[in-house]
């Protein structure tokens, strides 16, 4: 279709300035270098038009073809009066404003005044030589003087104007006559006045053919004496509309030069619209007619090609009225019950018109409406078959949909066509979210029955109201129950009363019922482990901590643990009692002996005595102690030889040390051993204190004897220390002995490594 539309839109509404763009004008060029003959090329059309029609008069003021683009100013500041050879559709705003009057004085700006505005727009003035008086001449004289490709001269308005009153014979479809805006001023004047007031088109009255010809003759006689410079037209042509394009076509085809004596009404449109030949109205009306015809043709084609499953009447003897009634009934039934004609062959185009999506049948969506449909006999999770055939018996859908109440959501009107982007933005609620809404919820648009079949839900075979609402990806959004909505400017506006109409849904379902099988406290293992793990935080005395602090901490912790573990079995208590009694007796004796040794070595008196003993090797007691500790550490702690001559350290003690150290290493891995060891911390506090006192008395005397009897050959084998820290119990593979040193040297904490070599 050829329908003109505005190209530039950023303009002010009432004769305002262009906001972004200006066409090239005379104001931007040096004055007098270029005239409008060089700025436009419609003079070619003037010559061709004059040659074909043999026009005798100067017709520059007659048509928009000749005089529209050679108006007062080339500036585009007032977009209604010049376009410099371009179309200007910029100001199609209000067609009811009264046309302005132009007051023109020589060597002054052309002033445009309007009755409905206090503004006055000024056009660029054209300087003329002072001695030249302006004139008019017939087009025959001009043709002899000018070249065939030169422009017909156009005159400035300083007096009366000669205009011819005939229509523009550019085509058969022109519907405009050009009426003179200076019709009231076409009176013979003997005095050549320098100014002329042009009345508006509302003031200009239509005049008959005879009166206008008389006026033209008097004007030509008055202006014949004047010399002939180049002229410009400062007049804006007025356009008068003929009745309609139908009559104008017939009239112009009959005779080109015939004038219609019918009454002419002023065309109400803004002066910004300038179309060559005045064909804008014709093309707009033509476009409207073509649109109407195409719409009718489209409806006819859609009825022929995509008939809405009109079933043929079986008997051929029926009348036309019965056929029409049957067609209407069939259409209504089709929209109500069956969306697909089971008997007709379906093409992808027909499927698309009948609400198919990617060759999948629409009936899939009826099966996916779980709350609406009755529970089916087959309890299988619903799956979409991509090889679903169109032809299947009609009884299945009738059985499914006969006894079930219709949901208000399911509407069988043809769905709106949506683009891919609008489908992504569609405010759709999947049926999985509908099953999650409780039945008594006011916001739910589908009432959920209590006896919903558990296996027919879309997303999972388990039906639970507590699961998080997430959905599987569907084959197509049109196969899913959607909210009623309207698509306005490619945006979906929901029509439901839900407060939260759009629910964000992800790809899969998280069933929270599986998370509730375990209690929140005992979420990893059995309850016994939790009780044991709480008990496993038994306090182990650091090697350099005092015994008083250890005893206080153990008494406080053991009192709490006794209350918790009062109900344990008696057999395990007895076994753990015996084990811990043996374990604590050996460990406490070792730690006390180590402290005594270090205290004696650090003492100056004992160092002097011992240095005399070890004078052969020229090494201090500290070097010997370090050597023995390193050898003991590298020997994997299998044997400790600190107490060689002591009767307390027997073979049983060595085995018990190894076993007990392994027990401490594997406390969190082996729960039973941890319980036994921790329980006996409580029961043996009194025995520990007694044994420590006895051990101190015995070991101090024996240690002094051993230190006195040490020889250089026995140093590395006698002094060896093996200690296991409670921090080494996490992983037995990496649990190495930590040697206790004075607090100024090493401060042990949880952040230090498990094993240290000195």
UniProtKB/Swiss-Prot annotation:
Residue spans of biased composition, Low complexity class: 315-330
Subcellular location: Bud neck
Modified residues (Phosphoserine): 25
Chief place of localization: other
Keyword terms: Phosphoprotein
Biased composition (Polar residues): 338-348, 355-368, 400-414
Composition bias type Acidic residues, residue spans: 651-689
Domain of life, source organism: Eukaryota
Region described as Disordered: spans on this chain: 55-77, 314-414, 636-709
Basic and acidic residues composition bias: residue spans: 690-705
GO cellular component terms, semicolon-separated: cellular bud neck
Family according to the record: Belongs to the AIM44 family.
Protein name in the entry: Altered inheritance of mitochondria protein 44
Lineage: Eukaryota, Fungi, Dikarya, Ascomycota, Saccharomycotina
Gene designation: AIM44
